[in-house]
Amino acid sequence: MKTQRQQLILKLIASTPIATQDQLARELRRRGLRVTQATVSRDIKELGLIKVPAGENLYRYAAPPGQRLINPYGRLQRLFADSVTKIDDSENLILIRTLPGTAHAVASCLDSLDWPEVIGTVAGDDTILVIVKPKEAVATVLQRFRELGEG
């Protein structure tokens, strides 16, 4: 739901000049989504939306160049707290179990952090495989995951 809502937000701001959180919330409600101002505010922050000039003394929301997350660590903390159910490891692999449908979002956020020890992730519906190199770095990565979970 969250991913779909955020994708809709990106489509809306690309096609409609939206200047305020209230206006964005109204547009989402018009499309059948139940949202609060707090939800819209979090989505704006997680998506890293910026305000750009839209005429004289007017501004509108826009996606940042390249649409990279501005605060991927903060988003990952929230995703870990909300989604991760179990973490296990073997050799240079870490397996993260999540609630159904959330693994891709968690893996995408992990990838955006560009940790040098993580050479890649593979996500299914509720499972993420994290590949660590060298295998001696697994303990370091697991500690980071624990810290994320403690938020």
From Swiss-Prot:
A Pfam match: Arg_repressor_C
Keyword terms, alphabetized: Amino-acid biosynthesis, Arginine biosynthesis, Cytoplasm, DNA-binding, Repressor, Transcription, Transcription regulation
GO biological process: L-arginine biosynthetic process; protein complex oligomerization; regulation of arginine biosynthetic process
Disulfide bonds: none
Main location: cytoplasm
GO molecular function: arginine binding; DNA binding; DNA-binding transcription factor activity
Superkingdom of origin: Bacteria
NCBIfam families: argR_whole (TIGR01529)
Role, per record: Regulates arginine biosynthesis genes.
PANTHER family attached to this UniProt entry: ARGININE REPRESSOR
Family: Belongs to the ArgR family.
Name the record gives this protein: Arginine repressor
Protein's gene: argR
